[in-house]
């Protein structure tokens, strides 16, 4: 058992990922060729629709502001019940001329039962609120736009990376050239943190060992 304990420590220590500090290089979002239907008008530019207001994003490369307000509340529960029981009885009826009354007391019997019950519950909740500046990377023939925003922050070895993309209608952009996340279709949000603060929230190596030895 002692050898198994040290073997698990060695395996877990070898599996620990050591992060190397890499120089971050910004990559511009990929842009697509605009595909717009021909409008039979002298004012073909979409900006002409807002002659008395502020300029709103409408073409590839335009900047748009995205206000993210998302709440997460997930609850998952699992329960299992397993049971089994067996019983048997047998009596010896004849054995080399021994009297039947004597053999009746030589019967064999047994009973066994097994029951197992387990359950688990997972709950996660959180609120994500931020404002990002993104770009229009594609304009579809119906006027909707594919927008993408990314933000990368590194302070004292703690890294935060945020990526958002989705489809926006021009009508949902307000006069401040801002759209809220609840009006973005097919929205994808990627948020990841790396560093010693993030690792501090992870279980330690000893807790991982006990989780392997006692999974239930």
UniProtKB/Swiss-Prot annotation:
Compartments reported by the entry: Cell outer membrane; Bacterial flagellum basal body
Species of the source: Aquifex aeolicus (strain VF5)
GO MF annotation, one: cytoskeletal motor activity
Signal peptide: 1-13
Lipidated sites in chain (S-diacylglycerol cysteine): 14
Keywords associated with the record: Bacterial flagellum, Cell outer membrane, Lipoprotein, Membrane, Palmitate, Signal
UniProt-recorded name of the protein: Flagellar L-ring protein
Functional description taken from the UniProt entry: Assembles around the rod to form the L-ring and probably protects the motor/basal body from shearing forces during rotation.
Record note on quaternary structure: The basal body constitutes a major portion of the flagellar organelle and consists of four rings (L,P,S, and M) mounted on a central rod.
């Amino acid at each position: 058992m002692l050898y198994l304990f040290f073997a698990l420590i060695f395996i877990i220590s070898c599996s620990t990922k050591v992060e190397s500090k890499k120089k971050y290089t910004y990559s511009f979002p990929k842009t697509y060729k605009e595909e717009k239907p021909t409008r039979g008008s002298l004012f073909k530019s979409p900006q002409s629709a807002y002659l008395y207001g502020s300029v709103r994003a409408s073409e590839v490369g335009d900047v748009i502001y995205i206000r993210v307000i998302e709440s997460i509340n997930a609850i998952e529960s699992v329960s299992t019940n397993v049971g089994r029981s067996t019983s048997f009885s047998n009596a010896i009826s004849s054995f080399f001329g021994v009297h039947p009354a004597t053999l009746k007391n030589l019967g064999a019997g047994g009973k066994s039962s097994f029951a197992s019950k387990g359950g688990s519950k997972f709950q996660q909740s959180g609120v994500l609120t931020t404002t990002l500046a993104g770009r229009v990377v594609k304009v579809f023939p119906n006027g909707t736009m594919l927008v993408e925003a990314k933000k990368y922050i590194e302070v004292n070895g703690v890294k935060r990376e945020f990526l958002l993309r989705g489809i926006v209608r021009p009508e949902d952009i307000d006069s401040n050239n801002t759209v809220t996340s609840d009006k973005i279709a097919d929205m994808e949000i990627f948020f990841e943190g790396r560093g010693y603060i993030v690792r501090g929230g992870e279980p330690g190596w000893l807790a991982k060992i006990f989780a392997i030895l006692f999974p239930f």
